[in-house]
């Protein structure tokens, strides 16, 4: 990706690539209000939350104009905007300095501005305003989005300058991301716009234009193609009104507590159940750990997912944790073999310097500096996040049953039970036992970390064959071992020796003093992606998709069926500090019918039914 090639014609921002202005400097916010945000007035009284989508974020003028409208309102705005070439921070600041308006908004945006990485970047802009900045070409990023907009702002550069954003395929995607009754507004009355809207199912009307523009286009979606591609990955039914509803989250690791926090923030009365007598007794219970993404070659889905999760986690922890629990000093991930050197160096021409930078002269190996990586105290984070919740300790899950009143009755092994409206399993390594009858390929992996008396004065995590965190409270953590399907709660001397061997490039391990060890169990999936989403109806899938070997490319397969209001967020492996936050946000998106916080292709990779679907497509079930 590249930033916008922007210049100034006097005080007017001008895009050199498209040979067009972003807007006129004669109070352009008034045109934004007239053409675009006035559409909100037509439906303002009918809803409490709105999804507004836009083709062409540009300088963010329409977004800021909407922010002003929602500033003193209890209503919620979720704004989704695509952008091929984001404007540089310094140019954004200059634009609004020249305009003399929205200065506080632009400073806030600049402080949260995403790196130049294609995909969806979620920004919690205000308590009632969410911004999804979607970087990429319109025809490539729109198919990756999933929501039903209330209003569309069609605000790309003029059709004569940038025809690709007004193409037939783009209009089809706009219709897919709408519902019957969705409003579309644009300043343009060009033929390509009118034909594109009509062919996509919109009823077009021409309205009086702003100032010197004679007319503008307004349209309402009349009909929609309901054929589903990839029907087996269709979204579940949302919960509907949250008013008075309860949520039960099982598990008090990072995944469980982050999920509980997101649901509570959105109006649910949340209760958390924990099998043990305290929080974070398993994989989230380490004294110190690193927040860093798995870096693959560019474009690999596993790496794309980890970068998205990492960026969501960085924003979450910065907004919700005290600085004493996490330090964003960056991290160095060393390429200790030729394959890793190839992988990391392939990012050099990807304009990703805001995220990480490859340095072949680092010692003891070439490596990448991951700018916003951090070292954190997972156990203390869990204690902090749990402080505002009702937690039922010594409540180990046993079974569930759906009641006629729509609620779910959950029974625990201590003979107690609880009714809830929604149920979320954040059960880590216990998930393989709970969901043993599901085709999910979950396994438990034993991991041991070693606690050293401080031996290296590193200010950031160093990662090669193993990792070493900075010393915290007189303890330096190194790790970690991996032993799939092994159960042994007692630390092993040979595992401590392995951990020391794996960090021997960084210090003389013969001088290391071991002062302790910790064993935890992580959950892993068979394809290394977490398992996040609505829990599918296994029998429905086997019955209705048994012919996928022949029909997988058709659009007439029945829509997926799910166990009502049951969700899962587990199999986070060794990078749960990042992916658990993605899971919390994604489940909340599904529950509330919000836009998805991750691209559809990655949503499919996380889907709990993906292993079953792969077998059905191969005719193996």
UniProtKB/Swiss-Prot annotation:
Pfam families: DAO, Methyltransf_30. It comes from the Bacteria. Its EC number is 2.1.1.61, 1.5.-.-. Gene3D superfamilies: D-Amino Acid Oxidase, subunit A, domain 2, FAD/NAD(P)-binding domain, Vaccinia Virus protein VP39. Keywords: Cytoplasm, FAD, Flavoprotein, Methyltransferase, Multifunctional enzyme, Oxidoreductase, S-adenosyl-L-methionine, Transferase, tRNA processing. Residues 250-621 are annotated as: FAD-dependent cmnm(5)s(2)U34 oxidoreductase. One of its GO terms (cellular component) is cytoplasm. It catalyses: 5-aminomethyl-2-thiouridine(34) in tRNA + S-adenosyl-L-methionine = 5-methylaminomethyl-2-thiouridine(34) in tRNA + S-adenosyl-L-homocysteine + H(+). InterPro entries: FAD-dep_OxRdtase, FAD/NAD-bd_sf, MnmC-like_methylTransf, SAM-dependent_MTases_sf, tRNA_MAMT_biosynth_bifunc_MnmC, tRNA_MNMC2, tRNA_S-uridine_synth_MnmC_C. Disulfide bonds: none annotated. Catalyzes the last two steps in the biosynthesis of 5-methylaminomethyl-2-thiouridine (mnm(5)s(2)U) at the wobble position (U34) in tRNA. Catalyzes the FAD-dependent demodification of cmnm(5)s(2)U34 to nm(5)s(2)U34, followed by the transfer of a methyl group from S-adenosyl-L-methionine to nm(5)s(2)U34, to form mnm(5)s(2)U34. In the N-terminal section; belongs to the methyltransferase superfamily. tRNA (mnm(5)s(2)U34)-methyltransferase family. This is tRNA 5-methylaminomethyl-2-thiouridine biosynthesis bifunctional protein MnmC. It comes from Campylobacter concisus (strain 13826). The gene is mnmC.
